[in-house]
Design a protein with these regions (language model features):
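Mature-chain termini and adjacent capping regions
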Residues: 1-631
Length: 631
């Protein structure tokens, strides 16, 4: 039993030895059959101690950082002891974001960056280019989060529509916004077809590309072609396709000089405001808008202490002041509408500096190229037109300069100024004194030198007065024609200083004054009144003293009726002599006295001063009877 156990143990030991040799053999075979070539350790710049750093020459490096692919070229590349990496000499870095396809190109003499490209410093002729954006500066600082580019050492910036320079630059890639500060100079290209660019100078400039809006502040000056000006701040907006400037807003002490592309000839009667080539505008705020399909100004709006001035080569001048203004232009640059409101005032001066006309009111409106000029009153102020020879106040005043016509409507008040040096007078009123007029409507036609009034007209000078519903005044001749309840009131000079001043009133449906004949005529249902007597007739002929409004005689014709206290006279004609204080009735005159009965004669003379009546008959033997009422 013991021998069998020993034999089995030996067999088992032998098997183990065989198995061991087999394992060793297989292992040796596997080792020799799967042997790898000797590995070359990769260079890791960050792991190399400073004393062992080596510069790589003429490198081209690719780096994959998340969604970014970075390609770097340079004459030299090395890592510093500060854990930063350096590229030097003709450095160019191209970066593409996956999915966007936008390539960003960075160039410079030297670039410093960290391993994740979170912060990059570009030095020496540094530039960054992406799409149409190009930035150049001596030094540029790039930050990845948030992704920005900045410098404080002066920069140049350009894109399809904007280019310029400044001391400081800050650009946000995510917001596509640009900020420039310090001695900013900007060029905004105003449309693909426009040869001119909007040039800006300011302390600060900001532009947001998504909003197509920009802002300039701090001593802003601007120019566009021959147009130029200044303001505290300027805002602009491009059209959605960024092809042209859509709107410009200027704020704070704005001054602008606007020059039309072509000069429009100005002839006699033209409105300088409408056809002036150059306009100087001042206001607290000015907004300029362009046509949507062409780079030309369509409108200008101004607010706050507005002032506009235009001058002609001849020396004539126009100035406008108001709280608000608006101008609309046509596609050729001509003015098609002008509006000024809130305390609006327009002043025109002739080439010798004298006043041509002054207009003021709540609103001044120019339509067309000066075809119509209107002034409207406000709730507390009337419309005013003041010129060398007249002053007109109304609710609304309209001028048609090319036709030389003026119209005034509603609550019209006019003053015809004294014109002693001119031959013509206003009707029978003295030329040495002003004539005052009230009416519902007034019209003046310069070519005919004719005035027309309508509606409850009242014209007066001192105590002499003329009233009617319609009235025409020919200024060249001084002739006056009136219609509709015409009434004239004349003051009579007292013969003695102690006597009271008296007056005589005349009226009719129609009136005509002829200065050459010194004759004032009333027709249709005419009448006359004095302190003591009244008269009615078909017509009245008033003889006036030459060059004055003094009445000499009044002749009545047709169905004359005279009433003097208790007496009534009737005749075909009557002659009233104011200096003699007599009224002579002819043409079958008859006087009816309530106390003395009926008097007849060929001629009856009322002596208004002493209540006597002289009766005359033209028979073979002339007879005269004097009748006096008892006191």
């Amino acid at each position: 039993m013991t021998d069998k156990k020993i034999a089995l143990a030996r067999v088992f030991r032998a098997l183990l030895v065989v198995c061991l040799f087999l394992v060793i053999a297989v292992t040796i075979r596997y080792f020799f059959s799967h042997r790898r070539p000797a590995s070359v350790e990769a260079i890791k710049i960050k792991d190399i101690p400073e004393q062992k750093v080596e510069k790589q020459e003429g490198i081209e490096h690719y780096d994959f950082k998340g969604d970014r692919v970075i390609q770097a070229k340079a004459d030299r590349h090395y890592a510093g002891s500060d854990t930063l990496y350096y590229l030097e000499g003709n450095v160019e870095i191209r970066e593409i974001k996956k999915g966007e396809g936008k390539e960003r190109i960075v160039r410079g003499d030297k670039i410093t960056y960290d391993k994740d490209w979170n912060e990059v410093i570009l030095e020496g002729q540094a530039s960054l280019e992406q799409s149409d954006v190009l930035v150049k500066a001596p030094t540029l600082f790039y930050r990845k989060n948030p992704e920005t580019l900045s410098t404080e050492r002066g920069a140049l910036f350009s894109s399809n529509r904007i280019s310029g320079r400044a001391k400081q630059l800050f650009y946000s890639f995510a917001e596509e916004s640009l900020r420039l500060e310090g001695d900013v100079e900007i060029q905004l290209r105003h449309g693909p077809e426009s040869p001119d660019a909007l040039a800006l100078k300011a302390d600060v400039f900001i532009y947001s590309r998504p909003g197509k809006r920009g802002h300039a502040a701090g001593k802003v000056t601007f120019s566009l072609g021959k147009n130029h000006g200044q303001a505290d701040s300027l805002e602009f907006k491009f059209t959605p396709n960024e092809q042209q400037i859509e709107k410009i807003e200027l704020k704070g002490g704005v001054k602008a000089s606007l020059v039309a592309e072509e000069e429009v000839p100005i002839t006699e009667g033209d409105l300088l405001l409408a056809k002036a080539r150059e306009r100087e505008v001042e206001a607290e705020e000015i907004s300029l808008s362009a046509f949507p399909d062409m780079p030309k100004m369509e409108s200008l709006e101004a607010k706050g202490n507005c002032f506009m001035k235009s001058a002609a080569a001849s020396g004539s001048l126009v100035e406008v002041r108001s709280e608000a203004m608006k101008m609309l232009f046509d596609r050729q640059g001509g003015l098609r509408e002008f509006r000024a409101w809130n305390q609006a005032r327009l002043l025109e001066k002739q080439k010798d500096g004298s006043l041509k006309r002054l207009l003021s009111g709540q609103e001044i409106l120019v339509e067309g190229q000066g075809e119509k000029l209107g002034v409207r009153a406000g709730t507390s102020e009337a419309a005013l037109l003041d010129s060398q020879d007249s002053e007109v106040v109304a609710r609304e005043i309209r001028l048609f300069p090319q036709r030389e016509i003026m119209e005034a409507a509603e609550e019209v008040k006019a003053i015809l100024k004294p014109q002693p040096e001119k031959a013509e007078a206003v009707g029978f009123f003295a030329r040495e004194k002003p004539v005052f007029i009230k009416a519902h409507m007034m019209r003046f036609e310069q070519q005919q030198n004719r005035l027309f009034f309508r509606g409850d007209i009242r014209m007066w000078q001192d105590k002499d007065m003329l009233l009617a519903q319609q009235m025409t005044v020919l200024k060249d001749t001084g002739e006056i024609v009136g219609e509709g309840l015409v009434r004239a009131v004349f003051s009579l000079r007292p013969k003695k200083e102690e006597d009271k001043e008296e007056r005589v009133e005349l009226g009719g449906e129609k009136m005509n004054y002829k200065p050459k004949e010194n004759l004032l005529t009333f027709e249709q249902t005419t009448w006359l009144k004095t302190r003591t007597a009244s008269l009615n007739a078909n017509s009245l002929l008033v003889s006036m003293a030459e060059k004055s409004a003094d009445i000499q005689t009044i002749k009545a014709r047709g169905k004359v009726v005279v009433v003097d206290k208790l007496r009534e006279g009737q005749s075909e004609e009557a002659l009233y002599d104011l200096s003699e204080e007599t009224m002579v009735l002819t043409g079958n005159p008859v006087v009816t006295d309530k106390e003395k009965g009926v008097l007849r004669g060929d001629k009856l003379t009322f002596r208004l001063g002493d209540d006597r009546i002289l009766v005359e008959n033209k028979e073979k033997e002339r007879s005269a009877t004097v009748i006096k009422r008892e006191q």
